[in-house]
């Protein structure tokens, strides 16, 4: 599928999570954490492939950020479980204005829609971003750096398994197959589909394909 196809598919899944109760969202998140640990071996195999391909092309600091082991995956799962423990502010009234004519105006905290996250080669961002997006009642579109793509794709596959096992729509989290600069541009310019885009890239990555 093209980047735009995946964006549309992700956006179409939004009603399933924006209307979900806090209990339903937390059940999905807990299942995501469990699935991440259950798929540890598959994720580590993909990470080893990414590490082999990246050696000699990125710095030792970046290699360390890319590297995963069981302890790091356990920490990622614990991060998702920590999100479960956070308060759910969806629907919270932030302010109220009462007019003399009886009309009441509320400032209310509501989900935004599709949150796109464009990031470099940090596998832990994949699970952190997905968890926080779902907790807030939004859907998540991820675009990983090319060095971490195999790892990120395996993590997303595990998260989607967890979502499905908890009765959620797996398309509330998706990853773009295209890691080129063009795909990042497409995402940032997808008006009407993307509510918010967050970009965290190394300086040189913004100008390379």
Model-derived features with residue positions:
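Conserved small-residue-rich beta-alpha loop and adjacent elements
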Residues: 85, 89-161, 166
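N-terminal Rossmann-like NAD(P)+-binding subdomain of aldehyde/semialdehyde dehydrogenases
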Residues: 1-105
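A glycine-rich helix N-cap at a beta->alpha junction
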Residues: 169-175
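Conserved small/polar residues in nucleotide/adenosyl-binding loops
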Residues: 199-206
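A structured beta-alpha segment of the ubiquitous adenosine-cofactor-binding alpha/beta core
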Residues: 104, 175-191
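Short active-site oxyanion
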Residues: 192-196
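Hydrophobic/aromatic ligand-binding patch that stacks against planar heteroaromatic rings
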Residues: 132-133, 187, 207
